[in-house]
C-alpha cells in the first residue's frame, strides 16, 4: 500500500495531499503517532507519521529538519493536523517537501489521530491478509499442478496467465530450461547481471544493450542457487500480491528441480559405476560389456576418443571438501555445455576427474581443431565464472569400445604429464613417453644413486674428470666411433684413446660391453635432470 492508496481510506476523506505529490508511490508499511521532540530517532523506513505538531508550535523552523531526516530515513510521509497548534504549513516547507518528493498530508481537525492510525493499520492488515490468502491459494494450486505430473512448462504457463507476462526458467548458469511461451531472450548476455543477484529476493534491472527491463527471482535449494525465474518485463515492487504469487511458484519449482536433480544423480551414479567397472576390467565377458553399454547408448564397433579433465589445484589453502565441491560444480557445468560439442559425447566422472568419451571419426586431424576449440572455450568460461582453471588430457583414437580402458589410461597419462611439468589450464595430447619423460617419473634420489654408482669417480666435479666425462659422452653419442669423437672434440685420435682407457680404468669396466654402455648412456641422460 502506498500514500495514494492511504488517501482513499475513509478516515482520510477530508485530508489533503498538499506537498510531495511526486512521492505518492512511497510504500506505507506502518503508521506511527508521536509528538515528542526526538521523534525522528524512533522512525523507520516506509513508516507514515501522524502528528498534531505540538512540539513544533513554538519552533516551526524545526519542521524543515524533521522532513529532511524523514526523507533520509526513507519514511513514507508526514500527516499533520493543522488549525490546532500549527495554523498553516509554511510555503517554504511545502517547497522543501516537493524537492524531496516527500508527501505531506494535511489532516482535518475533527478526526482523532488514534482513529486515523487504527483505520490505516486495519487497512494494511486487511491487505496483508488478502495477500497471504492469495499466496496460500497460489501455492496450493501450483503444488497440485506439479503433483498431477503436468511438468514445469505447464506450471510456467499458469504463472504467465496470472501475470499476463511471459515467464522463463533458467538454470544457475543462465541457460534456458523451460518457458511459458516461444520467446527469444539472449540469456547469455544476462549471465553477468544474474550472477550479481544474491539471496532469494525479487529484483528488477534494465539492460542498456537492448533497453529492456527484466524481473528476476533466484530459486534456491539447500542454500544453493539452482536457477532463476525470469520475467522479461517490469513487475512493480509495490504489487505484493503478484510478487507473493511469483515466490510461491519459485518454491514449487524449487521442489520440482530438487526431484529432477535426484533422478539425474541416480542416472549419473549408474553411468559412472558402469564406466568405473569397465575401465577397471571387472566385467566377466565381452557380452556383458555389450549389454551394459547399450543402456548408455555406447556402440561396440564405434571408434572413440577419451578426454580426461581435472580442476587445477592453484591454491593449496583450499580444503579437500571445498575443492571437491568446486570440481562437482565445474563438471556439472561441463555436462550442460556438451550439447554444443562438435562430436557425439558421453560424460562420466571418476573421482574428481571428468571424462568425455567422444564418438570419433577415422582421423584425429579431422577432429583436432573443433575439439581443441571447444575445450579452450570451456576453459575460458570456467575462468570467468568459477575463478578456477581446468586442464585436459586427450587420448589417441581407439578402434572399438573394448579399447576404451586403454584410451582412458592414455588420457590420464597426458593429464598427469601436464601436471608434472607444473602447468595449468593446459590441453595435453597423449604421445608415447621418451626416455627423459620416463626418467622424470622416478624419484630424484633414485636417479642420483644410479648416476653415482654407474659413473663412480667420474661423477665428481673435478676438472680432469670433467674432460673425461665429456669425452665419454661424445664417444657414446657417436656410436663408439673414435675418429668421429676426435673430430668433434678437436683433439688428436690418440688423446681420445688415452681418455677412454682412463675412463675404463676408473670405472673398472670395458667400454665394449653393451650392458656397460647402456648404463652409461642412461646415467648421462640423468645428469641433465639432476643438475
Swiss-Prot record:
Q: Name one GO molecular function term.
A: DNA binding
TM spans (from-to) = none
Identify the InterPro entries for this entry: CdaR-like_regulators (IPR051448), CdaR_GGDEF (IPR041522), PucR_C-HTH_dom (IPR025736), PucR_C-HTH_sf (IPR042070), PucR_dom (IPR012914)
Pfam hit, one: GGDEF_2
Top-rank taxon? Bacteria
Q: Which UniProt keywords apply?
A: Activator, DNA-binding, Purine metabolism, Repressor, Transcription, Transcription regulation
The induction field says: Expression is very low in excess nitrogen (glutamate plus ammonia) and is induced during limiting-nitrogen conditions (glutamate). Expression slightly decreases when allantoin is added during limiting-nitrogen conditions.
**Which BP terms from GO are recorded?**
positive regulation of DNA-templated transcription; purine nucleobase metabolic process
Family note: Belongs to the CdaR family.
Q: What is the stated purpose of this protein?
A: Activates the expression of pucFG, pucH, pucI, pucJKLM and guaD, while it represses pucABCDE and its own expression.
Please identify the protein, giving its name as recorded. Answer: Purine catabolism regulatory protein
* Organism name: Bacillus subtilis (strain 168)
**What gene is this protein translated from?**
pucR
Amino acid at each position: 500500500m502506498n500514500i495514494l492508496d492511504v488517501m482513499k481510506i475513509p478516515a482520510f476523506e477530508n485530508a489533503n495531499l498538499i506537498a510531495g505529490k511526486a512521492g505518492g508511490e512511497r510504500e506505507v508499511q506502518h503508521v506511527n503517532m508521536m509528538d515528542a521532540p526526538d521523534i525522528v530517532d524512533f522512525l523507520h523506513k516506509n513508516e507514515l507519521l501522524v502528528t498534531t505538531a505540538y512540539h513544533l508550535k513554538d519552533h516551526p523552523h524545526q519542521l524543515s529538519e524533521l522532513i529532511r531526516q524523514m526523507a533520509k530515513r526513507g519514511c513514507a510521509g508526514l500527516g499533520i493536523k493543522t488549525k490546532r497548534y500549527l495554523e498553516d504549513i509554511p510555503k517554504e516547507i511545502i517547497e522543501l517537501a516537493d524537492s524531496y518528493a516527500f508527501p505531506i498530508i494535511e489532516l482535518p481537525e475533527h478526526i482523532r489521530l488514534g482513529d486515523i492510525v487504527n483505520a490505516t493499520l486495519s487497512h494494511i492488515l486487511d491487505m496483508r491478509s488478502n495477500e497471504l490468502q492469495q499466496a496460500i491459494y497460489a501455492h496450493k494450486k501450483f503444488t497440485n499442478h506439479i503433483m498431477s505430473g503436468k511438468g514445469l512448462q505447464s506450471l510456467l504457463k499458469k504463472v504467465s496467465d496470472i501475470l499476463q507476462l511471459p515467464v522463463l526458467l533458467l538454470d544457475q548458469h543462465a541457460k534456458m530450461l523451460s518457458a511459458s511461451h516461444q520467446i527469444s531472450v539472449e540469456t547469455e548476455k544476462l549471465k553477468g547481471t544474474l550472477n550479481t543477484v544474491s539471496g532469494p529476493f525479487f529484483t528488477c534491472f534494465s539492460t542498456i544493450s537492448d533497453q529492456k527491463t527484466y524481473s528476476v527471482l533466484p530459486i534456491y535449494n539447500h542454500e544453493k542457487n539452482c536457477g532463476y525465474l525470469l520475467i522479461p518485463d517490469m513487475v512493480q515492487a509495490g504489487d505484493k500480491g503478484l510478487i507473493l504469487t511469483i515466490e510461491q511458484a519459485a518454491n514449487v519449482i524449487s521442489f520440482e528441480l530438487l526431484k529432477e536433480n535426484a533422478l539425474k544423480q541416480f542416472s549419473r551414479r549408474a553411468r559412472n559405476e558402469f564406466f568405473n567397472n569397465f575401465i577397471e576390467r571387472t566385467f566377466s565377458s565381452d557380452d556383458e560389456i555389450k549389454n551394459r553399454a547399450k543402456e548408455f547408448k555406447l556402440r561396440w564397433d564405434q571408434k572413440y576418443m577419451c578426454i580426461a579433465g581435472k580442476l587445477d589445484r592453484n591454491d593449496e589453502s583450499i580444503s579437500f571438501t571445498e575443492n571437491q565441491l568446486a570440481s562437482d560444480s565445474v563438471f556439472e557445468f561441463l555436462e550442460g555445455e556438451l550439447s554444443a560439442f562438435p562430436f557425439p559425447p558421453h560424460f562420466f566422472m571418476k573421482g574428481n576427474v571428468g571424462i568425455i568419451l567422444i564418438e570419433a571419426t577415422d582421423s584425429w586431424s579431422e577432429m583436432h581443431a573443433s575439439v581443441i576449440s571447444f575445450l579452450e572455450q570451456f576453459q575460458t568460461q570456467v575462468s570467468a565464472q568459477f575463478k578456477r582453471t581446468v586442464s585436459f588430457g586427450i587420448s589417441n583414437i581407439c578402434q572399438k569400445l573394448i579399447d576404451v580402458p586403454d584410451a582412458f589410461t592414455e588420457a590420464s597419462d597426458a593429464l598427469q604429464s601436464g601436471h608434472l611439468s607444473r602447468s595449468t589450464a593446459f590441453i595435453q595430447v597423449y604421445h608415447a613417453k621418451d626416455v627423459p619423460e620416463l626418467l622424470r617419473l622416478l624419484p630424484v634420489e633414485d636417479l642420483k644413486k644410479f648416476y653415482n654408482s654407474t659413473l663412480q669417480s667420474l661423477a665428481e666435479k673435478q676438472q680432469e674428470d670433467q674432460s673425461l666425462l665429456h669425452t665419454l659422452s661424445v664417444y657414446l653419442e657417436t656410436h663408439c666411433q673414435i675418429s668421429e669423437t676426435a673430430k668433434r672434440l678437436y683433439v688428436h685420435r690418440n688423446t681420445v684413446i688415452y681418455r677412454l682407457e682412463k675412463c675404463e680404468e676408473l670405472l673398472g669396466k670395458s667400454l665394449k660391453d653393451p650392458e656397460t654402455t647402456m648404463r652409461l648412456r642412461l646415467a648421462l641422460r640423468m645428469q641433465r635432470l639432476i643438475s
